[in-house]
Structures are given as structure tokens and as C-alpha cells.
Amino acid sequence: MTGTRREGLVYGLGALHAAARGDRMMWALHRAALSNGIVPVIPAVAVAEGYRTEARSDRIGELLAGTEVEPFAGEAARRAGEIAARCDTSDLSVVAVVEVAERRNCAVVAQRQTVLRTAAALVGHELVLYAV
């Protein structure tokens, strides 16, 4: 671990699920980020997957009110697709999280640790991960 300072946070699908189930640590982390001027980022593809798979969409909406939703288009979508092919996964929401974290130099709040670490290693990004 080189101790590289991260510029922000990227939320993955696991962060949305944790927020939807009312996870206190997730909400505390989110409030702390906002109170310190950090606006977490979440890829649009992870937002879509969150609404597809989570019954408590009201809580997802609450969380999203304090985040920046990163569009999943153009160059970012191309890079995510290439990373997904290289790490042999069809989970674009996870790979999009790594793509955003690498490009923006962010730490990650997510759940799928194995895929995240594999994808991060492929792009040469030292992953700082808070697992929810």
C-alpha cells in the first residue's frame, strides 16, 4: 500500500443495497463524506442495477440526492467494456465503478471485492475499498 491520497468516493451497487436496507455504517459514511465536502460519485449503470434489484427504492433516492451520478457513455463506457472483457465478467456495474475510481482517483464503497480487485489490478489502480 503506497498510501496514495484519494480525491473522493465512488459508490458501487453494494453501497446502494446497504443504504436501502438502512445500514447505519453506510449512512454514517455518507453523512461524513458530505459534511467534509466530498460528493460521492456513482456510475449510472450501478444506479440502474440498484433500482432493478432493490425493493427499498425510496432509500436509494435519498442516497442519490447527495451524490453525483456519472453518465455511462462514450469513452467511459468503452473503457468499462474493455476492462470487463479483460477480467472475464459481464457485471458492467462493478467494472464501471473501477473505471470511475481509476479515472478520478477515488476510493470505493462496494460489495463485490473479488471482481473489483481483479478489474483494478488490470488497469493498474491501487484499490482502496470499504466493503459494505
Regions found by a protein language model. Give the residues of each.
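Acidic catalytic patch
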Residues: 67-88, 99
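Short active-site oxyanion
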Residues: 36-39, 66-68, 102-107
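Short beta-strand scaffold positions
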Residues: 71, 92, 109-111
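Short, structured loop/turn "capping" segments at alpha-beta junctions
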Residues: 40, 90-93
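Short, well-structured N-terminal submotif of metal-dependent ribonuclease cores
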Residues: 1-41, 51-62, 122-132
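Acidic, PIN/NYN-like endoribonuclease modules and their adjacent C-terminal/linker elements
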Residues: 1-4, 98, 102-132
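A short acidic, often aromatic-flanked loop/helix-cap motif at beta-alpha or helix-coil junctions
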Residues: 48-49, 75-80, 132
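Alpha-helix capping/helix-boundary segments
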Residues: 15-16, 46, 76, 96-97, ...
